[in-house]
Amino acid sequence: MRDKIVVKGAKVHNLKNVDLQIPRDKFVVFTGLSGSGKSSLAFDTLYAEGQRRYVESLSAYARQFLGQMDKPDVEYIEGLSPAISIDQKTTSKNPRSTVGTVTEIYDYLRLLYARVGKPHCPKCGKEIQQQTVDQMIDKILELPERTRIQVLAPIIKGRKGEHIKVIENIIKGGYVRARIDGEIIDLQEESVKLEKNKKHTIEAVIDRIIIKSDIRSRLADSIEIALKLSEGVVIINVIDKEDILFSENFACIDCGISIDEISPRLFSFNSPFGKCDYCDGLGTLLEIDEKLVIPNKSKSILEGGILPWANTVTNEDSWTFSILKALSKKYNFSLNTPIGELDEEIYNMLLYGIKGERIKVRYKKDGRAVDFNHTFEGLMNTLKRRYMETNSNYMKDNIENYMSDNFCPKCKGARLKPEALAVTLGEKNIFEFCKMSIREELRFLSELMLSNKNKIISNQILKEIESRLQFLIDVGLDYLDLARMAGTLSGGEAQRIRLATQIGSSLVGVLYILDEPSIGLHQRDNDRLIATLKRLRDLGNTLIVVEHDEDTMRAADYIVDIGPGAGEHGGEIVAAGDLKTVMETEGSLTGQYLVGKKKIDIPINRRKSNGKSIIVKEAKENNLKNVDVEFPLGTFTCITGVSGSGKSTLINEILYKGLNKKLNNSKEHPGLHKEILGIENIDKIINIDQSPIGRTPRSNPATYTGVFDGIREVFSNTTESKMRGYKPGRFSFNVKGGRCEACKGDGIIKIEMQFLSDVYVPCEICKGKRYNRETLEVKYKNKNISEILDMTVEESVDFFKNIPKIKNKLQTLMDVGLGYVRLGQPSTQLSGGEAQRIKLASELSKRSTGKTLYILDEPTTGLHIDDVNRLISIIQRLVDGGNTAIIIEHNLDVIKSADYIIDLGPEGGAKGGEVIGIGTPEEISVNIDSYTGHYLKKML
């Protein structure tokens, strides 16, 4: 096998005919400025070609489901292995996806609980035993005399297929009837054809009996036959009543409860046999929230105190006003009384209605007053009913403004049926086990006391679970729990989970391509991550890691520095070799930082607070230990601490959601805390995260920053536009008129691939230009609107230099290092770091109020050291305007540049959630309890 991967003539995106040789079975780092072409080379060239070759090796039948994969723009690649990409973008937002299911640990857990778990009665909690035939008969004979019953033997339960053989065997056994999918079928008279792809339940009718005192012997024979046929389970179908289930295996005689066979699917919240029926296995329910319906009880009904009625209650001709007027007359209350001062009975009546009563409502329609006798179901019930009945997405979205997620009242968030939760192992059910931290779970399993028989049964299962838990600990995720929803994980956490899963698979000879695995990881945990990456390499794999972390670069076998600049100014190999080679390469910006020629300077002065602050009192969400935290205003404050110490909980779940609820009436519930003081000191809160600036290719930097409005105005003021009567709307690709109607102004056509990701292809009519021919005939300085959208920010700053309104907004994009981005670049093609900097640029271009609080969660994701330097300057500019920046960060260059640090810890998970230190970087660096301080000391 070749010892190198040879890339010849790569031209994907901004790559400039790149030739590169990468050593195989080594740990290789790709680095360079944000937008220099690292991802284009790693993901869009190497990974894409590896995937394409793999797909081409499949049969034509398999390929038809995967679609045609385009060949990357590269002359050739030699020595390429099958490629696996572990990036940060593929986190599942499906509420059914958890850490346990993603890592497949939950599958092994289900098997473990099914094989060695102890079943208990879900009602009384007693450990349940097997039932004898005599016990079953005694229970049946308690039914009233002359009750008609059928003895059924369940043969197939919820399985797909035509089940022809099963039905034939029932007939051969001499049974003439069967209950199929709940319906009794006469097998002699009807030919049964079942749909192959649907799930079916088949139960043979063994006997039909009328309860009498002398049927004991016959009943015993029938039950024994049924038990034999169905492997220990019998169903007594009481005509016109509910079935009674008996099991030779597990039943509580006291409560009369029998449990079906304990199989792995009983513990699956995605299976109809295991999931909680009330919440459908989600653990939460979206319900109308009284606090969102009435956020301010000091307002009266006529003042809009009840939000869903706020727009219609002031219109005296509306139905809402008419019915409320009738209610106020009948129950003697005023619509001008503050809601909080209404009698409890009136308050409840408005929300939950009046049962069994009708009220006389006078309603004006078309100038005529009409009297109705009408029921009133209450606002909460009306909203719930409309939400369930409507097919309108607009209506659903509107009602969802008054809804919030709450724990399911039946399963209390556990997602499973009571029968599943009644099975324990070491005194814990499967949900209680999953709620422990991964480190605690590993300890629990190592201390588990099992009988010799159960040890033999569970030996292999436990090995699989324990090894996977250990891999998660190795990548710094010991603080997570298996019940955590995958959608709530950060990009870095999700990526490291997939990394741990890959180590568990022990593949050899694979090309792994990773996207910044160090994101979200404290310096303390970085060594373990690097050791894990080396372990993956030592198995016999090639690792290409797109990374900016200095420790990772120093640990790599080979570094490829791509640049020298970003976008149009990048796409070349600046340096390639070991650490020493890169450090000695003159043109390498990375090398200059590694060798110390360039560095991020420590601020000469640190700001003092403006004397005002925001204080979070008694924060106790997740692992926070009832802490009080004061955030000084007018400063740049960093929130630090090891992974899982409570940073995101404190800032995103409590501070941001709490302030957003107060300032913007957000429907999101903040995490548990007593109160937030000092809210009057700010007027705006903005969370500048790395989520996309838009969900579709229709959104782009020009539309997001608002610069496109000015550009459209310029085009509408040209002589040609005035002659044709074109207004600014003519140059919008979102409305009819000037856009290409074939692609509705997208420039591309979306092809839905059903169970695969959607595929986008260029529009054949406008050739991707978005506009129709007439619109493109209008030019400003010899450029049409499509050509403007194709310009980079850098080109457009010069192009619009005489129009301050446009130039100033574009200049802020230049200031944040996005000169290489095209104005019309679809948001779907922007990295998280680029999206975040576009949001920062948009904020910089606005007039500062001096009372804005900015929150950023790990803004250095995807940024080179030089980009980080620029980011710090932007944050300092925002704070210089009197605003406040609160930043969650592990990057020591950002931390050393802050005015204040709030350090949480000391550990992650249950051992975290305390404030370890508050102060300047210099003060934190001498705090002996602070891991952050230990690493920070070397930087100051």
Swiss-Prot record:
Forms a heterotetramer with UvrB during the search for lesions. The UvrABC repair system catalyzes the recognition and processing of DNA lesions. UvrA is an ATPase and a DNA-binding protein. A damage recognition complex composed of 2 UvrA and 2 UvrB subunits scans DNA for abnormalities. When the presence of a lesion has been verified by UvrB, the UvrA molecules dissociate. It comes from Clostridium tetani (strain Massachusetts / E88). A zinc finger (C4-type) spans 252-279, 740-766. Keywords: ATP-binding, Cytoplasm, DNA damage, DNA excision, DNA repair, DNA-binding, Excision nuclease, Metal-binding, Nucleotide-binding, Repeat, SOS response, Zinc, Zinc-finger. This is UvrABC system protein A. Belongs to the ABC transporter superfamily. UvrA family. GO terms for cellular component: cytoplasm; excinuclease repair complex. It comes from the Bacteria. The gene is uvrA. It is found in: Cytoplasm. ATP binds at residues 32-39, 641-648. GO terms for molecular function: ATP binding; ATP hydrolysis activity; DNA binding; excinuclease ABC activity; zinc ion binding.
